[in-house]
A protein has these predicted regions:
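Generic detector of contiguous secondary-structure segments
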Residues: 1-3, 166
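Active-site beta-loop-alpha junctions enriched in small/polar residues
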Residues: 1, 26-29, 64-67, 96-100, ...
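A short, local hydrophobic-aromatic micro-motif
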Residues: 21-22, 149
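Catalytic-core regions built around general acid/base machinery
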Residues: 7-17, 78-85, 139-143, 173-177
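Active-site acidic/histidine proton-transfer and metal-coordination neighborhood
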Residues: 13-20, 30-123, 132, 201
């Protein structure tokens, strides 16, 4: 992968656009056809950690393939095969829930962490996907406070992404729970709205809204 990606160019383009930090590098889910197939894919996923290191990102984020009868077995085997390949890398893997994927519910994370104890593997919270799936996200945070490495901040009406502060999700509650566990990671805004032409304005409004929420909960503005 590092042969195919011009990392220096990506960094320069990000700087030209005014971006100052890369909070995560996103990668493909492990294949789920068989345990052997997932294990064989570990080497390619390990390359993501080198890309992330060069990008200055602390995290690699992946989700799961669509839910099938094969269950989480192949994905867990793939992660286990990945860990020895990244043991000298300080970066961490933060598993994100996706609506309809095999990583979605509280029980999915429970099954993963029953077999994988490494602190190098944790959770990306995603308020939108949790809302779509009806997940008890507070219980997940309470169960795994030290494994919460990342937060994708979304607001939704039903399964549809909407601008932050205009939907049904208790984002204030998320900030309260994260503050209570001492979370210091990213608040990564995601907007998958039906009117993408308005994204520049929605991003500006999201920044103001999030700063307000953080100030309201913690008493100080975030950096």
């Amino acid at each position: 992968m590092t042969r195919w990606v011009n990392i220096d160019l990506m960094i320069q383009c990000a700087r030209d656009a005014g971006l100052e930090q890369c909070t995560e590098v996103y990668g493909a889910a492990f294949p789920t056809g068989s345990v052997a197939e997932a294990q064989a894919a570990a080497g390619f996923r390990a390359q993501l950690f080198e890309v992330a290191r060069q990008m200055g990102s602390p995290l690699v984020v992946i989700t799961g393939r669509p839910r099938t009868d094969t269950g989480l077995g192949p994905t867990i085997a793939g992660i286990k095969a990945l860990l020895p390949l990244i043991e000298n890398n300080p970066l961490r893997l933060a598993l994100e829930p996706h609506f309809g994927s095999q990583i979605q519910f509280f029980e999915d994370y429970e099954a993963i962490f029953e077999q994988i104890e490494s602190p190098q593997v944790g959770i990306t919270l995603d308020s939108g996907h949790f809302h779509s799936a009806g997940v008890d996200w507070k219980s997940l945070i309470h169960r795994y406070p030290k494994r919460i490495y990342n937060f994708h901040v979304k607001d939704h009406i039903g399964t549809q992404s909407v601008p932050l502060g205009t939907g049904e999700i208790d984002l204030h509650g998320y900030i309260e729970e994260l503050h209570a566990i001492g979370y210091e990671g990213a608040l990564a805004v995601e907007l998958e709205v039906v009117d993408p032409e308005n994204l520049p304005r929605y991003c500006e409004e999201a920044f103001v809204y999030l700063r307000y929420l953080v100030k309201n909960v913690t008493g100080t503005f975030p950096d």
